[in-house]
């Protein structure tokens, strides 16, 4: 499968599964799991999967703790993200998402537990007009001692953020064949 920058043989993988249940036209429940293999340092092969061109924000929690920034102290533990979410479509123009993520390492690390922490993400979207959407969200994360070691920081401090975004996507070229 090639070699990494340290000339180690790479043997890594990613697996993803998502299931959704549409209750009615307004409510949908979603469950998903993403597994990115990690390296525990006990092999002659490097087993940590590299997303390379990531979509971290979309899949691994809105707070971008994973794969938008590197792991610290030489760790490459991979990631196991289990998500449970609900979507409420209030109207044709307004929808809301609430997602819970539980993060753990994919690889067993010496003297550390696998649990990294949990995150809750809330987002509301409003289609103001044809090409304009207003979105807002709020997220918070509770990390563990393992998170402190592999990512840095202090798991006892409250971690949260809120945001507002205006997305303008005009159709600039339309060709009909």
Regions found by a protein language model. Give the residues of each.
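Transmembrane beta-strands of outer-membrane beta-barrel pores
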Residues: 1-3, 33-39, 100-106, 140-144, ...
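Extracellular/periplasmic loop regions
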Residues: 1-89, 95, 149
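Hydrophobic, lipid-facing positions within transmembrane beta-strands of outer-membrane proteins
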Residues: 13-17, 80-84, 118-122, 160-168
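Repeated loop/turn-to-beta-strand initiation elements of outer-membrane beta-barrel proteins
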Residues: 26-29, 92-98, 126, 130-136, ...
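Flexible, surface-exposed loop regions and adjacent strand-edge segments
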Residues: 46-52, 114-117, 151-157
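Outer-membrane beta-barrel "beta-signal"
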Residues: 66, 157-177
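Outer-membrane beta-barrel transmembrane domain signature
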Residues: 74-81, 85-119, 127
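C-terminal beta-signal and adjacent terminal beta-strands/loops
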Residues: 130-157, 170-174
């Amino acid at each position: 499968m090639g070699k990494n920058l340290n000339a180690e043989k790479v043997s890594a993988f990613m697996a993803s599964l998502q299931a959704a249940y549409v209750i009615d036209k307004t409510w949908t429940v979603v469950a998903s799991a993403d597994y990115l293999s990690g390296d525990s340092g006990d092999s002659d092969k490097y087993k940590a999967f590299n997303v390379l061109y990531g979509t971290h924000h979309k899949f691994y929690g809105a707070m971008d703790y994973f794969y938008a920034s590197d792991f610290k102290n030489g760790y490459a533990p991979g990631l196991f993200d289990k998500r449970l979410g609900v979507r409420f479509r209030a109207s044709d123009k307004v929808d809301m998402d609430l997602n819970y993520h539980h993060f753990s390492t994919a690889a067993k690390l010496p003297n550390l537990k696998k649990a990294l922490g949990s995150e809750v993400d809330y987002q509301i979207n409003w289609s103001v007009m044809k090409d304009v959407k207003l979105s807002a969200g709020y997220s918070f994360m509770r990390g563990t001692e393992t998170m402190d070691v592999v990512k840095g920081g202090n798991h006892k401090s409250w971690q949260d953020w809120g945001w507002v975004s205006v997305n303008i996507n005009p159709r600039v070229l339309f060709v009909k064949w």
